């Protein structure tokens, strides 16, 4: 049986061709044996602008809104028409028994193929290649277990729903606000609420009025303790004068044992956040780099929203850990079949174990090292520590000192690769300090501070805010989806910058 394969981009098509034996280069496709492999160029077909539905929409008028297409039109951009014609000819050919959708295994990949397939008027039966790695073995296994294309009808429906909602809100909202305010205002389903979060935070910062407060700090026998905040400076002066040069007593010592589990593996958003935090990479930079690593067969599918692996991947991860660290740790900590969605968490591939990685560029090396580090960190023991709160009494006034004892470093013992390590501000509890201990003489000093405004968003914190937006309004985890998807949040942030909104 002869079959046609359509990938999302040329580089992926070449990787697939090597596995299934399509080596002969033709115009717009590769051929060999019983298969032909071609590719899309990203979104070849997209929904038409309003003027393609009616000439009158070329002029923006408030009275024409809302624009609600009765029948949606897909258009191929001029620069992609030549390649679309090649795909249409292949999809209409009677030489093939079926076509394999080998676009990215996700919602947008499904839409990219289905739109081209529909516009071409193809009647070929569709099979689906669904893989989480570009390794040769993964591609071969995927072709050995192709799915029926109809199993992904709901995924395509979800993509169409998203695309049409974006069109309706974007086209109508942009025209409405532009006409209302007399200058171009772009509106987007995800873009606008994200901008609203930024605006709300910026307003809080700009309108914040800092207010002074005062504390009194007493020092003696190596102990530094401080009072509560005081609004009135004269109150602080009174406390300082009363305690300076006096004796103090350790009133109580409260210990709280705490445990912090190892972090989960990377999904795309968490990787983008930490790459921004440690290296200053933008979300778009990180997505571009990890996508290239994926296409080079060094990491698994990057556009995932899962931070776990499935049970059948335990041995693979064990092999990876043996190679990269020699210590396996507790792999079961990251195994959860129920929390793996379309794809498991981002991992290095087994192929990466065989490759010479010294040739990776600086940025690629950092992202790859970060993924390996997170895999190693995720199987480490918990970080266990003890918070100690010491109350010191002086002249009938209470002061507190805070200490932290690290009982087990666990996953925190692994330094972030290629990043300057933060110096800990924690102070260990003095071993000889006991309840009732007398401090013969303390010095007291008044300290002034100021209340702080909310911090401006970084890409790290904004991505987190987008991911968790609306969570308080929903009880079920299935309803907590936030703003955007791991694959689209970077583009939204880029849009806000390019439009001059931030």
Role assignments for model-derived ranges:
Residues 1-163, 167, 173, 453:
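Intrinsically disordered, low-complexity regulatory segments
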Residues 12, 109-112, 157, 161, ...:
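Hydrophobic (often cysteine-bearing) scaffold residues that line and stabilize catalytic clefts
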Residues 103-105, 273, 303:
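Short glycine-centered, acidic/aromatic-flanked micro-motifs in structured strand/loop junctions
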Residues 333-359:
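Acidic, turn-prone loop/beta-hairpin segments
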Residues 36, 45-77, 89, 185-291, ...:
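Long, highly charged, low-complexity internal segments
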């Amino acid at each position: 049986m002869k079959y046609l394969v359509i990938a999302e981009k040329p580089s992926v098509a070449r990787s697939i061709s090597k596995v299934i034996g399509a080596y002969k280069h033709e115009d717009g496709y590769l051929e060999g044996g019983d298969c032909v492999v071609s590719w899309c160029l990203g979104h070849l077909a997209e929904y038409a602008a309003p003027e393609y539905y009616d000439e009158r929409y070329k002029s923006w008028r408030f009275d024409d809104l809302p624009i609600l297409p009765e029948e949606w039109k897909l258009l191929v951009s001029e620069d992609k028409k030549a390649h679309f014609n090649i795909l249409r000819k292949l999809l209409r050919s009677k030489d093939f028994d079926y076509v394999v959708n080998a676009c990215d295994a996700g919602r947008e990949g499904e839409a990219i193929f289905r739109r081209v397939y529909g516009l071409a008027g193809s009647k070929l039966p569709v099979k689906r290649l669904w893989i989480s790695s570009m390794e040769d073995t993964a591609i071969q296994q995927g072709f050995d277990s192709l799915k029926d294309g109809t199993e992904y009808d709901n995924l395509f429906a979800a993509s169409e729903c998203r695309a049409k909602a974006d069109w309706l809100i974007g086209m109508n909202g942009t025209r409405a606000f532009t006409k209302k305010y007399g200058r171009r205002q772009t509106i987007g389903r995800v873009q606008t609420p994200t901008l609203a979060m930024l605006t709300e935070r910026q307003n809080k910062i700009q309108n914040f009025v800092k207010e002074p407060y005062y504390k009194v700090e007493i020092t003696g026998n190596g102990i530094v303790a401080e009072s509560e905040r005081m609004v009135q400076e004269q109150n602080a002066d009174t406390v300082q004068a009363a305690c300076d040069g006096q004796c103090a007593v350790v009133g109580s010592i409260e210990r709280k044992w705490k445990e912090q589990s190892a972090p989960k593996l990377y999904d795309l958003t968490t990787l983008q956040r930490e790459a921004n935090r440690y290296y200053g990479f933008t979300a778009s930079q990180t997505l571009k780099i990890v996508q290239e690593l994926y296409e080079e067969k060094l990491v698994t599918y990057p556009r995932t929203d899962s931070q776990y692996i499935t049970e059948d991947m335990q041995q693979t991860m064990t092999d990876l850990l043996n190679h990269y660290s020699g210590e396996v740790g507790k792999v079961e900590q990251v195994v959860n079949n129920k929390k793996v969605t379309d794809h498991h968490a981002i991992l290095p591939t087994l192929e990466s174990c065989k490759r010479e990685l010294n040739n990776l560029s600086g940025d690629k090396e950092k992202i790859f090292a970060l993924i390996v580090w997170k895999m190693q960190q995720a199987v480490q023991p918990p970080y266990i520590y003890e918070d100690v709160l010491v109350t010191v009494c002086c002249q009938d006034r209470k002061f507190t000192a805070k200490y932290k004892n690290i009982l087990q470093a666990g996953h925190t013992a692994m330094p972030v690769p290629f990043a300057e390590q933060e110096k800990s501000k924690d102070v260990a509890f003095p071993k000889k300090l006991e309840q009732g201990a007398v401090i013969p003489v303390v010095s007291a000093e008044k300290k002034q501070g100021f209340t702080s405004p909310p911090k401006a968003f970084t890409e790290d914190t904004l991505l987190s805010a987008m991911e968790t937006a609306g969570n308080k309004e929903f009880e079920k985890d299935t309803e907590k989806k936030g703003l955007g998807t791991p694959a689209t949040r970077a583009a939204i942030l880029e849009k806000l910058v390019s439009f001059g909104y931030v």
